[in-house]
Amino acid sequence: MQLAPAIPVLRIFCVEKAKEFYLDFLGFTLDWEHRFEPELPLYAQVHRDGLILHLSEHHGDATPGSTVFARVEDIVALQNELTDKRYGYSRPEAIHVGWGLQMEIADPFGNRLRFCQQIEG
């Protein structure tokens, strides 16, 4: 038996804001959306490269203010890509931490995406 990578579930409150942030700004791709009925809350999956996230409007699925820790190979390239988009609510910046580089970005719902690149040596 082998465990698969975890898929974090993040609470969202506005589908339009979530799509603007995760798809337009961060560059994720929408894989699928689900609603039990058209007026009911959204549950969706997005991905970028190997990082998969579930986004949910459902009250009991997740708590706002969660943090996702995601490893990246070139955090400076990601920082430059995101900065070039001139998103009005975030200007992410990689900082040095004891073991490498880290860049934390808050989504519109209080969740934090902590991108990290380990530096050898």
Q: Model-derived features: where do they sit?
A:
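N-terminal beta-strand motif that seeds the catalytic metal site of vicinal oxygen chelate
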Residues: M1-K19, S66-V68, Q118-G121
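C-terminal "cap" of GNAT-fold acetyltransferases
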Residues: M1-P5, F13, F36-L53, E104, ...
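Short catalytic micro-motifs in class I SAM-dependent methyltransferases
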Residues: I7, L26, R114
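Conserved catalytic-core motifs of GNAT/GCN5-like acyltransferases
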Residues: V9-R11, T29-E37, A94-H96, E120-G121
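Vicinal oxygen chelate
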Residues: C14-E16, V68-R112
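Conserved acetyl-CoA-binding loop of GNAT-fold acetyltransferases
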Residues: D24-L30, Y87
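Conserved short beta-strand elements that form part of the metal-binding/catalytic scaffold
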Residues: D31-S66, L113-Q117
